[in-house]
Amino acid sequence: MTQTSAAPTTTPSFYEILNLPFPSTGLSKQQLKIAYHKALLKHHPDKAVAVAKENLPSSNHGPAQPPSNQKITIDAITTAYKTLSDPVQRAEYDRVLRLDRNRVNGAGDKNGNGTVFHTGLEVVDLEDLDCDEGGDEAMWYMACRCGDERGFSLSESDLEREADSGEIVVGCRGCSLYTKVLFAVQDD
């Protein structure tokens, strides 16, 4: 039985706080800075009245907006800006945001959008896996509760294949369990 009678009370995403579209792959540092300054002006207690009267036009690319009854703090705006300004933090935040939205939305639709949600799917970070760098390419592995010490195994080429999504679902080689591994691609 699902609950649909009450609207979920969620905090706005960093993209909603800064009135930016998600995902925003082509977002420049200048666009981010402009959005940050607009958000500060819009939500600052001393400036909010003046900005509300201006009724600024929205952009054509369909930015996400927080619910109008949400109170956005200056600290939240600053945190959003700092997180989205750092490429590594932003990639991690985007992954977590996608994962959370998949859980809320039932993890995909009948058109193949989104990912399939597996009940009991354990989500881990690549750093939580053991790494074996001997041989032609690095291998990451993790023990499964079925007893196989290297039940969940993946190679560097597996990670490269899924670099755009930053996540990969791996099945145990000894049983029917799956785990989702999250990772970030770092440019050297």
From Swiss-Prot:
DPH-type MB domain: residues covered: 120-184
Compartments where located: Cytoplasm; Nucleus
Pathway(s) this gene product operates in, as recorded in its UniProt entry: Protein modification; peptidyl-diphthamide biosynthesis
UniProt binding sites for Zn(2+): 144, 146, 172, 175
SMART domains per the UniProt record, alphabetical: DnaJ
GO CC terms, sorted: cytoplasm; nucleus
Domain of life: Eukaryota
GO molecular function: metal ion binding
Pfam families, A to Z: DnaJ, Zn_ribbon_CSL
Key words, A-Z: Cytoplasm, Iron, Metal-binding, Nucleus, Zinc
Major place of residence: cytoplasm
InterPro entries recorded: DnaJ_domain, DPH3/4-like, DPH_MB_dom, DPH_MB_sf, J_dom_sf
Chain ranges of the J domain: 13-97
One Gene Ontology term from the biological process aspect of the record: protein histidyl modification to diphthamide
SUPFAM superfamilies, A to Z: Chaperone J-domain, CSL zinc finger
Domain observations: The DPH-type metal-binding (MB) domain can bind either zinc or iron ions.
PANTHER family named among the record's database cross-references: DIPHTHAMIDE BIOSYNTHESIS PROTEIN 4, DPH3 HOMOLOG-RELATED
Family that this chain belongs to: Belongs to the DPH4 family.
Task performed by this protein: Required for the first step of diphthamide biosynthesis, the transfer of 3-amino-3-carboxypropyl from S-adenosyl-L-methionine to a histidine residue. Diphthamide is a post-translational modification of histidine which occurs in elongation factor 2.
The name this protein goes by in its record: Diphthamide biosynthesis protein 4
Native organism: Emericella nidulans (strain FGSC A4 / ATCC 38163 / CBS 112.46 / NRRL 194 / M139)
Name of the gene this protein is made from: dph4
